[in-house]
Amino acid sequence: CPFLYRLVVIRRQKMMCLAGFSLMYIFSYICAKTDSVFLLALCSIFMGFLRMVLMMVNLFTLIKYAGHIEAYDKITPGNEPTTDEGWDKLDIERSAAQPAIYLFFMVLGQLGTSLTAWLAFEYEWQYIHYFMMGLLLLCILITFITMPYHKYTTRRFPINFKQFGNASIFCITLACITYVLTYGKVLDWYDDPTIRWATVCAIIAGGIFLYIESTQRNPYYQLDVFKLRTIRMGFLFYFLLMVLNSSAMFVNVFTGIGMKLDNFQNATLGNWSMLGYLIGGIATIWLSVKGVHFKYLFAAGFLLLGLSTMFMYFEVQGAGLYERMKYPVIIRSTGMMFLYSLIPTYATQRMPYKYLSSWICTMLTVRMVLAPCIGAALYTNVLQERQQHYVTRYAQNVDMLHPEASASFTQTVQGMQYQGKS
């Protein structure tokens, strides 16, 4: 993300799309064929970088041709408004434009999730990559036919390899933190040596990254971005949002364990979130244009998340119905749309354009890495503790004299013995 401005101002959309789609085709083929977890992780890192670049390139192209707006001028340092009226006008434009952009991408993301779940359910997980390879070939063909060719206007490429080193250190830090938070419960936290080593690596890599960025003349990441109050508040809001949103896992836990639904049915249930995104997007645009203050919109978003959780609290019961599970999904996604689209608008008020790339990096790091991992670790540990508590509570007076428990235990033991387990 800190490469955002330097990449998009190249203005060679056709070259970047062809190169990006071709590389993603190669990485998808490797993911479909390999059995190495290391290669899968490495290809995922490269594909994440390419997806972000291609998304931004295509977004700026779409804004130009669909909205007849030169988006590059809106992020070029030095082009900031010089008056309060100009900043107010820009804030109103962002309040209306960003919900529409987020609605577009979030609906596409949900469609992609549903499609991948269907492919994995009907066939095998490798077919997800084969399908993606076919789409990439189609994208390459469309790019060849529709996009004009632009010559490179400068001799020097805007990104040097030193900055890729900084980016690698940053990725190592996030990867180590993610490993600790994801596998900590499975490996019994710091009783496992890999968790200890990952923690040490995260601290060392994070320290090196902060030292390099604070001493370089042209840093990869602008640490001064945290001097802005709106950025700090945006960081906090996104952190709270994604930690609270991690409670959505309880819907899948309830439908999977209580209703015995498979992954495809759970993904189908998630399609109702598109209705919530649509409701939230339209409401956000309308209320923003009407000039409703941010504090009321944020309060409405968090209130909807709370209502979704409250619905689940009263709905989790033996007589719970699958058809009623769509309501917490719709309510939560409506609140998500409020907060997802307006937090960036609030955080970037009066923000100099030179900090835009660093803010996007901060936003995605919190929204897609740190907060979801912390939220998932928190809720899974709470869920495990509660499960152990209630299993112990209800099983303490059950023995082999209980006919149903005895039959279930005997069947499980025989099944394990047939599999060669002792």
Regions found by a protein language model. Give the residues of each.
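Helix-loop-helix hairpins in multi-pass membrane proteins, especially solute transporters
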Residues: 9-164
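Hydrophobic residues within membrane-embedded alpha-helical segments of Major Facilitator Superfamily
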Residues: 20-24, 30, 46, 53, ...
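Alpha-helical transmembrane segments of multi-pass secondary-active solute transporters
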Residues: 16, 97-98, 127-132, 194-198, ...
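Membrane-embedded alpha-helical segments of multi-pass transporters/permeases
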Residues: 29-32, 140-145, 207-210, 310-313, ...
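12-transmembrane solute porter fold
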Residues: 2-8, 14-17, 27, 220-388
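Hydrophobic transmembrane architecture of multi-pass small-molecule transporters
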Residues: 369-422
